[in-house]
Design a protein with these regions (language model features):
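Flexible "arm" and connector segments at domain edges
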Residues: 1-132
């Protein structure tokens, strides 16, 4: 009999579907802390699937999965969708959205004391400093 390793968080009804199909599962219930880690891992999995989507319909399906995981993370953390929307709108009003498609390749800052120099240097993996 073929056995496949899943080793991942699944939607609530998936295990029942397997049992109804006569499959034998090895499962366990995640602790609250482990569930949050698993949800974050699931978010990465679903984001990868968004990236791999090749049709409009599959993109919609994968975006719905991302939204479901985001909603589960928020619920787990005691955050409401209204909380998220309020912060999203505030950030959009202050920083803008992504509709213009601006992609910054590099930024040269003429002043060492600029607050952005310190900001970038605090995250060298994210913002590597380019030597000329």
């Amino acid at each position: 009999m073929p056995t496949f390793k899943y080793d991942k968080l699944v939607r609530d009804n998936i295990a029942d579907w397997h049992v109804q199909s006569g499959h034998t599962l090895v499962t366990y219930q995640l602790t609250k802390a482990d569930l949050l880690r698993a949800l974050v891992g699931k978010l990465h999995e679903e984001a990868d699937e968004v990236s791999a989507s090749e049709t409009h319909d599959s993109l919609i399906e994968e975006l719905a999965d991302v939204q479901e995981v985001l909603m589960a993370i928020a619920k787990h953390a005691g955050i409401t969708l209204d909380d998220i929307e309020a912060v999203r709108m505030a950030k959009t009003n202050r920083k803008g959205g992504f509709s213009k498609g601006v992609y910054i390749e590099s930024v040269t800052m003429p002043n060492e004391d600029d607050k952005w120099v310190q900001y970038c240097r605090q995250s060298p993996d994210k913002y590597p400093e380019i030597s000329e």
